[in-house]
From Swiss-Prot:
Main subcellular location of this protein, as a coarse class: membrane
Originating species: Canis lupus familiaris (Dog)
Compartments where found: Membrane
Gene3D superfamilies according to UniProt: Zinc/RING finger domain, C3HC4 (zinc finger)
GO cellular component: membrane
Identification of the protein by name: RING finger protein 141
Span of zinc fingers (RING-type): 156-193
SMART domains linked to this entry: RING
Function: May be involved in spermatogenesis.
């Protein structure tokens, strides 16, 4: 039964436009990701950015979980990963960006896919060191550019086209046109179905909520849900 459902889901994904299918896959993956798997991916990117692909380069990327952002039971909503580009010879931090979980998963897929190709090319070269140096001479800068793109271009989670104007307390973002059309009939998030009980339960992107804002909101929702429990 489970296999049949999985096959049907994959069949639907195959019929979707590539960009939308990729988004659906990322949302599903972030939903099933465990905390241990998340930390493993952070460590894997650090390994690729220093010990493997960028081992002979002047610059490398360092990925760290922002202290305190993963301490909540709702860590998937509030966790942040800090990506820092560092000059190895001087130790100077040249750039730094903060990503949410969805953006991090996108970057993880991009980097691991690209790195596997670079490493495969290096392994078949007659002079692996020379090939690695030429192919990945600016790898840290290229990857940092991708981080900047992900964090600068927040897209609408519905149409995947318009720039996001609003962000809901669950951290999903939408353009005004799409969320207006959805909210005519529904009072929940189109992605995760989190209920919106008030008329103003959203933030404009320019006034995006802090991690504490989102965590407190979800904790309040949990307090109001269900029946009192007496151990």
């Amino acid at each position: 039964m489970g296999q049949q459902f999985s096959d049907q889901t994959q069949l639907v994904l195959n019929k979707l436009p590539e960009k939308v299918a990729k988004h659906v896959t990322l949302v599903r993956e972030s939903g099933s990701l465990t905390y241990e798997e998340f930390l493993g991916r952070v460590a894997e990117l650090n390994d690729m950015g220093t010990a493997k692909v960028a081992s002979g380069q002047e610059k490398h990327l360092l990925f760290e979980v922002q202290p305190g952002s993963d301490s909540s039971a709702f860590w998937k909503v509030v966790v942040r990963v800090v990506c820092t580009k560092i000059n190895k010879s001087t130790g100077i931090v040249e750039a730094s960006r903060i990503m949410n979980l969805y953006q991090f998963i996108q970057l993880y897929k991009d980097i691991t896919s690209q790195a596997s190709g670079v490493l495969a090319q290096s392994s078949t070269s007659e002079d692996p060191d020379e090939n690695s140096s030429s192919v990945t001479s600016c790898q840290a800068s290229l990857w940092m550019g991708r981080v900047k793109q992900l964090t600068d271009e927040e897209e609408c989670c519905i149409c995947m086209d318009g720039r996001a104007d609003l962000i809901l307390p669950c951290a999903h973002s939408f353009c005004q046109k799409c969320i207006d059309k959805w909210s005519d009939r529904h009072r929940n998030c189109p992605i995760c179905r989190l209920q919106m009980t008030g008329a103003n339960e959203s933030w404009v992107v320019s006034d995006a909520p802090t991690e504490d804002d989102m965590a407190n909101y979800i904790l309040n929702m949990a307090d109001e849900a269900g029946q009192p429990h007496r151990p």
